[in-house]
Swiss-Prot record:
This is Casein kinase I. Gene3D superfamilies: Transferase(Phosphotransferase) domain 1. It is an enzyme of class 2 (transferase). Keywords: ATP-binding, Kinase, Nucleotide-binding, Serine/threonine-protein kinase, Transferase. The keyword Nucleotide-binding applies. Belongs to the protein kinase superfamily. CK1 Ser/Thr protein kinase family. Casein kinase I subfamily. One of its GO terms (molecular function) is protein serine/threonine kinase activity. Casein kinases are operationally defined by their preferential utilization of acidic proteins such as caseins as substrates. It can phosphorylate a large number of proteins. It comes from Toxoplasma gondii. PROSITE patterns: PROTEIN_KINASE_ATP, PROTEIN_KINASE_DOM, PROTEIN_KINASE_ST. ATP binds at residues 15-23, 38. InterPro entries: CK1_Ser-Thr_kinase (IPR050235), Kinase-like_dom_sf (IPR011009), Prot_kinase_dom (IPR000719), Protein_kinase_ATP_BS (IPR017441), Ser/Thr_kinase_AS (IPR008271). The active site is at 128 (proton acceptor). The keyword Kinase applies.
Length: 324
């Protein structure tokens, strides 16, 4: 039996699941366009889909922000219909044998900084910056990095008065321990600086293949979080970034030097990585490590289906992502 949501969306197969619900592929029955459909039980102890859909609407129109097509209740589920995107950076990292080239890391850093700055400009912090929460687009948008999953996002300042939330301590860890900032581990209320520090750990994860605080043995979740914090605090940034360009050390030192209410200098951080990019002689051509891996898979898939599609390299139209 065909299941429909929102009157015009057909529910297809399950493509993923998270702590708050399941994600299905779907299609607009009028246009045939594919979409992603997120379902959350209305009995959920901590419902977050309505909150997340409101966040997407607030951020709507930003580059690398998926569009919500419909939100509502169907039967026993809260339902959100949203743009269908490509694989996550975690998926692509695995496809690339868990190591990314410096060129790919720097092109990602540029876009990821843009996404985080845009979210911050709308008075919210993400609070769960990790490779799984950045996805690439599909088709013509294959070179665009999208930021997703705003279930843990929090307003850090009043949109009217610009009043920042107060400094607080004794907070539980929100987000993913592997990438959490040291201040988050210490129970300090998160602010803009923490999203950026988390991004620094994501970039080093891509560079190195893993982080020193991965795979630590522990009996309880608290014990594990404590061990991750101890290892993170006792690993000097210079050791974490050893064998990699000094810009990564500069980036993390800068993030850790920010005070709670400070507005980060996003342009400075982008420039830091762009200068390194051009010093290395790279071309800003949006060819990532996975571009040709995917192309080979696509070609095999097309051959098997006996369908010929001209192989075009797509370059993002957005001028904001291009080097100055």
């Amino acid at each position: 039996m065909e299941v429909r949501v929102g009157g015009k969306y057909r529910l297809g197969r399950k493509i993923g699941s998270g702590s708050f619900g399941d994600i299905y592929i779907g299609a607009n029955i009028l246009t045939g366009d594919e979409v992603a459909i997120k379902l959350e039980s209305i009995k959920s102890k901590h419902p977050q889909l309505l909150y997340e859909s409101k966040l997407y609407k607030l951020l709507a129109g930003g580059i690398g922000i998926p569009m919500v097509h419909w939100y509502g209740i169907e039967g026993d589920y809260n339902v959100m219909v949203i743009d269908l995107l490509g694989p996550s950076l975690e998926d692509l990292f695995s496809i690339c044998n868990r190591k990314l080239s410096l060129k790919t890391v720097l092109m990602l850093a540029d876009q990821m900084l843009n996404r985080i700055e845009f979210v911050h400009s709308k008075n919210f912090i993400h609070r769960d910056i990790k490779p799984d929460n950045f996805l690439i687009g599909r088709g013509k948008k294959m070179s665009v990095v999208y930021i997703i999953d705003f279930g843990l996002a929090k307003k850090y300042r009043d949109p009217k008065t610009q009043q920042h939330i107060p400094y607080r301590e004794g907070k539980n860890l929100t987000g993913t321990a592997r990438y959490a900032s040291i201040n988050t581990h210490l129970g300090i209320e998160q602010s803009r600086r923490d999203d950026l520090e988390a991004l620094g750990y994501v970039l080093m994860y891509f560079n190195r293949g893993s982080l020193p605080w991965q795979g630590l043995k522990a009996t309880t979740k608290k014990d594990k979080y404590d061990k991750i914090m101890e290892k993170k605090m006792s690993t000097p940034i210079e050791i974490l970034c050893k064998h990699f360009p000094f810009e990564f050390i500069t980036y993390l030192n800068y993030c850790r030097s920010l005070r709670f209410e400070d507005r980060p200098d996003y342009a400075y951080l982008r420039r830091l990585f762009k200068d390194l990019f051009f010093r290395e002689g790279y071309q800003y051509d949006f060819i990532f490590d996975w571009t040709f891996i995917n192309t080979e898979k696509d070609r095999a898939s097309r051959r098997s289906q006996q369908v010929y599609v001209e192989d075009n390299r797509q370059v993002e139209e957005n001028q904001n992502e291009l080097p100055m």
